[in-house]
A protein has these predicted regions:
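Short, surface-exposed coil-to-beta transition loops
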Residues: 84-87, 102-104, 122-129
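A short hydrophobic beta-strand element
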Residues: 96-111, 126
Length: 158
């Protein structure tokens, strides 16, 4: 009976540790999207969320962080009104020192219409995404983000 009780206690401690461990990569992913939001961009601590050799593969192109920041500047990201990402169906896999997360990302953006001054557009997207994170000095950071757009709807706001 004592052995069974000890086994149950150890099992719950292991599950609690596993949940905490799985929460750390998700916290990094959510922190990245928070730092990327127009309300916080450019975020002075983006390097807290990505590695020095970070790579994002989006729209059929590979971008380093500096390349992606230049792409955002070219898209006049600093004039956008709002950005929102809703992540769901996250699957977290852990290995020693690394994590992989696959998830569905639904995003909604409001920004000025580049072809019609004074008009705003609302863009709704759904992506299937995957990130690879590594643990650097006790902190998970995103090394690679793969994004495949599943749907995109753009509408003019009244």
């Amino acid at each position: 009976m004592l052995v069974l009780l000890i086994s149950l206690v150890l099992s719950s401690v292991t599950r609690a540790e596993q949940m905490t461990t799985r929460d750390a990569p998700m916290a990094t992913l959510l922190g990245f999207f928070d730092a990327l939001s127009v309300e916080n961009y450019p975020h002075s601590n983006m390097q807290d969320w990505v590695t020095d050799d970070f790579l994002i593969f989006e729209m059929g192109q590979a971008f380093s962080w500096d390349d992606f920041a230049a792409f955002l500047a070219e898209a006049s990201y600093d004039t956008w009104v709002s950005t929102e990402w809703r992540l769901s169906e996250a699957r977290v896999s852990l290995t020693e020192g690394a994590a992989h997360i696959s998830y569905v990302n639904r995003g909604e953006f409001v920004y000025p219409d580049p072809d019609n001054p004074g008009q705003q557009l609302k863009e709704s997207n759904m992506w299937l995404e995957s990130v690879y994170l590594i643990n650097e000095e006790g902190q998970f950071r995103i090394k690679f983000l793969q994004s495949d757009n599943v749907s995109r709807v753009v509408e003019s706001l009244p």
